[in-house]
Amino acid sequence: MKLLIVTISLSVIAIAFGSYLRIGTPKTVEAETAANLLPETVKFRIDASKSRFMVYADRTGVLYFKGRSHQIAVRDFDGEAALSLNALNPASLALNIRAASLEETSDVYTQKEKDIINGELKGIVLETEKYPAISFKSDEVKGEFRNGHFDIKIGGDIILHGVTRHIVIPATVTAEGETLHAKGEFSLDRKKFNVNATNAFHGTVRIKHKLNFTFDIVGERVQ
């Protein structure tokens, strides 16, 4: 009789254990369900050739230089953006800029003046041999979806002139088919990054502290 009871008990335990293995623990089921509910993330590679990234520096000075601002184009940059096409998060942005690719584009300057500005931009302002890269990496994305686009604020760390600061970049983002489009603007205080003001043209020009950035960036979907 005892042998029969033991046999039945072992059978019940075996059946229960088998059911446990097939079904899994409640935590496992919850984790699998949560994973299935996560939005699919799509990656886009930034295409500098189709994008526009500008830096505007207002100036004060004397004589005919007064009131003529700098329009600096960022020529060489790359990076990757990731987001869900039907939800704001998860989302991220990583951007790398070759500092030596920045150059004056304003048509108010002669080519000789542009050469002077570009030389000081690389040698004095950005010190590109010492600090060849400018980078940004997001750690938080907030915002909402409205009228077919995302209005977002991208928080993250920017490294400029060897100094790391946390900034927030507002942007309007749309994704259509294979293409991502992001537009926006933000500003930085050059003094917080130990960036020198150039004194081109024998000291007649002085750049203000505030640098204004505008971007119209295109990314192509990574297959």
What are these regions (language model features)?
Residues 7-16:
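Hydrophobic membrane-insertion alpha-helices, especially the h-region
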Residues 1-5:
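Positively charged n-region of N-terminal signal peptides that target proteins for export
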Residues 16-223:
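Low-complexity, acidic/polar, glycine-enriched regions of mature
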